[in-house]
Amino acid sequence: MSQPPEHPGNPADPQGGNQGAGSYPPPGYGAPPPPPGYGPPPGTYLPPGYNAPPPPPGYGPPPGPPPPGYPTHLQSSGFSVGDAISWSWNRFTQNAVTLVVPVLAYAVALAAVIGATAGLVVALSDRATTAYTNTSGVSSESVDITMTPAAGIVMFLGYIALFALVLYMHAGILTGCLDIADGKPVTIATFFRPRNLGLVLVTGLLIVAVTFIGGLLCVIPGLIFGFVAQFAVAFAVDRSTSPIDSVKASIETVGSNIGGSVLSWLAQLTAVLVGELLCFVGMLIGIPVAALIHVYTYRKLSGGQVVEAVRPAPPVGWPPGPQLA
C-alpha cells in the first residue's frame, strides 16, 4: 500500500505522531497562529523565540495620553451661531466689568475727538449772518459757514485721529476677547494694550482703501470686500500675519463657510442694534457681546479653539435621598 506524500519541510514523525503533552514543537517548526481575536489560553506562556501574532489589520495600540502642555479643555472646531451667542453671553457674564469699562472709556474718547474736531472746525471757519424780514414784519437770520484752509486742515487731522482711535479700540477689544477665548486672565488694562498695533493700522488702511475704491466703481463690490475681509484684523492681532496675508486668510475663512459668516455678522449687528434701542446704554453690553461673537466665529471658522463656557457649579452637599413614608 502506498504512503501519503510528505510535505516539504514537514518530515514524518518518527514517533508516529505521539508527543508528550507539554513538549515544545521541534526547532524551526512554528505553531499555527491563533484565530483572529484570540490569544493564548490563560495561565500559559509563549516559548522562547515565539512571537505573538500581530494585531488584525486596521487596529493598533490604544492611543496614549496627549503630550504635556496640550490643552485638554478646548472645544471641537465645529461652528454654530447658536453656540456662538451662548458662549459669548456666558463669557460676558463672567467678565462683565472688565468688558464694559473699556468700552465706556473708548466711547468717551471717541466723543471727545469728534467734539473737539467739530468745535475747532466751526471756530476756524468764516461765518456770514444774513437777516431777513418777511412781509408780515417777522425777522429771521441765517448763518452761512465757509470752511477756511485752517479749518480744512483741522478736519483732515481729526479724521486721521478718529480713524487711528477706532483701529486702536478695535485691536484693543480684540486682544482682550482673544485672551478670554484662550482662557487667560484679563483685566481692564488688557483692553488698552493691543497686540501688533502696527500690523493692525496697515491692515485697516488696506481694507479702507480697497473698500473705498470698490465703492467708487460700484457700491456692491466695496460692501462685498468689506464683508469677506471682516476677520483680517483678527488675523493680524492673533497670528501676527502681514496685512496682505491677513486679508487673504480672511477671504479664505469667510469663503469656507459663507452661511456661518453671514449668520454671525447678523448676530453681531443685532447685538449692537438692540443696544442702540436701549438709549445707547445697552451698547455697553451689545458691543462686548458682538466682539465675543466675532472672536468665536473667527476662531472656529479658521480652525482655532476657544475655552468652554463656564458651567454653574453643582449645589454643595449630597443630594437628598429617597423619602420613606
Swiss-Prot record:
TM stretches of this protein: 96-116, 153-173, 205-225, 273-293
Biased composition (Pro residues): 24-70
Location relative to the cell: Cell membrane
Chain positions covered by the region annotation Disordered: 1-75
Protein name (Swiss-Prot/TrEMBL): Uncharacterized protein Rv2560
Membrane topology: Multi-pass membrane protein
Biological classification of the source: Bacteria, Bacillati, Actinomycetota, Actinomycetes, Mycobacteriales
Any GO CC annotation of this UniProt entry: plasma membrane
